[in-house]
Curated annotation (Swiss-Prot):
Keyword Metal-binding among record annotations: yes
Species annotation: Xylella fastidiosa (strain 9a5c)
Intracellular or extracellular location(s): Cytoplasm
Gene label: dnaJ
Domain notes per entry: The J domain is necessary and sufficient to stimulate DnaK ATPase activity. Zinc center 1 plays an important role in the autonomous, DnaK-independent chaperone activity of DnaJ. Zinc center 2 is essential for interaction with DnaK and for DnaJ activity.
Protein name: Chaperone protein DnaJ
Main subcellular localisation: cytoplasm
UniProt xrefs under Pfam families: DnaJ, DnaJ_C, DnaJ_CXXCXGXG
């Protein structure tokens, strides 16, 4: 199974201190803990991923191994303490039936998170990102040997696999002598310590398509970690996180916003201008509009990244109570209020009428 970079999982830089790691793990654990997300398989998987990342990075020796060799440091039991991936186990046993496990090996996948403004997510954007990765050691040219000399493993004869007979079953598994590499290095490279790869950073240009949303992932084939002994590199997965917008809330391809209006506008009707992602639009508010009324502007939402259809913009009216009144404004409002004296509230205030009817019905039931 492809694994994300442990630092990316916890959301910390590679220079993070022990306290930073502990705080990041606590946040992650609280967010994805199964007790907080009952029945959520995705949250359970994320919790296990956070736990695995912290167990490695919180251990000084394991962290040093991981920083040098990446996930490869813990494959096939190397590094100690970590349980092997079940997919790797079955790959060791049955891999050669389908062409050999060693032939299918490649570098680890890498995860990266990019934050966008809503406008960038809607319109699409090109971003330059710098990612930590493992690349071929230029000192030994990936051989892992200081003098360039490697010996073919005598146990597996260079295949990286050994055949084991268990009763009537013959199985293939990773060679315990060379760890699946197929070669023995007597004089390890002083730069990469025999790994054949070193840690580096590379800058990539990522084109993020219009319409992406929170959690969407973009796959860049072959931009992950370089595999050992020249095998193909893994992939890079760029995950999108969209920042909160001060005006709009996104729901799929639709957008929602609140439009404040004055009492007089709501009572008498008016035309108000509202912001959209591509400028402004007008809403005609009829007289006697109540707070909470929704108006839909078709096609003013987000263009879907998959179907290319456009969502809508829903504007919710919020009737505001005026503040900081002048003496004259207060006097006019008092005069306006006096015009309701003796009037039935049901005539002018439909919600008040409903409320009063509910109160009366409640007390009638209580006293009957």
């Amino acid at each position: 199974m492809s694994k994300r970079d442990y630092y990316q999982v916890l959301g910390v830089p590679r220079t993070a201190s022990e306290d930073d790691l502990k705080k990041a793990y606590r946040r992650c654990a609280m967010k994805y803990h199964p007790d907080r997300n009952p029945g959520d398989a995705a949250a359970e998987a994320a919790f296990k991923e956070c736990k695995e990342a912290y167990e490695v990075l919180a251990d000084t020796k394991k962290r040093k191994l991981y920083d040098t060799h990446g996930h490869a440091a813990f494959e096939h039991g190397v590094g100690g303490g970590n349980a092997p991936d079940m997919n790797d186990i079955f790959g060791d046993i049955f891999g050669n039936i389908f062409g050999g496990a060693r032939a299918s090996r490649r570098g680890a996948d890498v995860g990266y998170m990019v934050e966008l403004d809503l406008e960038e997510a809607v319109a699409g954007v090109e971003r330059q990102i710098q990612i930590p990765t493992l690349v071929e050691c230029t000192h030994c040219h990936g051989s892992g040997s200081e003098d360039g000399h490697v010996e073919t493993c005598g146990t597996c004869r260079g295949s990286g696999q050994v055949r084991i007979q268990r009763g009537i079953f013959a199985m293939q598994q990773t060679c315990p002598h060379c760890g699946g590499r197929g070669v023995i290095i007597r004089n390890p490279c002083k730069v990469c310590n025999g790994a054949g790869r070193v840690e580096d950073h590379k800058t990539l240009s990522v084109k993020i398509p219009a319409g992406v949303d929170n959690g969407d992932r973009i796959r860049l084939s072959g931009e992950g970690e370089q595999g050992p002994e020249g095998v193909p590199p893994g992939d890079l997965y760029v995950e999108v996180r969209v920042r909160e917008h001060p005006i709009f809330q996104r729901d799929g391809d639709d957008l929602h916003c609140e439009v404040p209006v004055r009492i007089s506008q709501a009572a008498l009707g008016d035309i108000v201008r509202v912001a959209t992602l591509d400028g402004e639009a007008e809403i005609r508010i009829p007289a006697e509009t109540q707070s909470g009324k929704l108006f839909r502007l078709r096609g003013k939402g987000v263009r879907s990244v998959r179907s290319r259809t456009e969502g809508d913009l829903y504007c919710r009216i919020v009737v505001e109570t005026p503040v900081n009144l002048t003496a004259e404004q207060r006097k006019l409002l008092e005069q306006f209020e006096m015009t309701f004296a003796g009037e039935d509230a049901r005539k002018h205030s439909p919600k008040s009428a409903t409320f009063l009817d509910g109160v009366k019905s409640f007390w009638d039931r209580m006293t009957s």
